[in-house]
Amino acid sequence: MRCLFQVFYIYMQRTEISSLGEFALIKRLTRDFPIQHESTRRGVGDDAAVIAYPEGLQTLVTTDLLLEGIHFDLTYTPLRHLGYKAAVGSFSDIYAMNGHPQQLTCSVGVSARFAVEDLEELYAGIRLACSRYGVDLVGGDTSASLTGLCISITCLGAAREEEIVYRSGAQPT
């Protein structure tokens, strides 16, 4: 019974985002994201990421925006699933062009109804996607939102120029 109470107590803890400050929040959300690519020279924790792809590779960049009430409903979507979906959705754009996703940034706008623990759940889904597909989280931003949750994911990938597949190259079957 004691163990069940401890789990319930941990679940019920609510840390206000404003109580941490920007840098402590970033550190808490990104502490378990390892760097997996040599091309990631500097990731989270500086003013900008530093990325250097080897010669011969082109950089592919895609951005996806997800808005609560438009692209997802939190009544039916756990935050961990949403984080995974947001990340993998951007990876798929890179894969569609025959590239390999390498780096990811995640920016979120959150209303006061979200706690730090909620953002940790969102980032747990992103972390799982990054781990599964070998992608580095290299930056992002957080901001207050008056109307729910907004997630913007930017994914960078690499491909050899001669191997890139464009939509314009699609042929009817």
Regions found by a protein language model. Give the residues of each.
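Glycine-rich anion-binding loops of enzyme active sites
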Residues: 66, 101-172
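Residue-level signal for inorganic ion chemistry
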Residues: 50, 90, 98, 137, ...
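A short, N-terminal amphipathic alpha-helix
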Residues: 86-97, 130-133
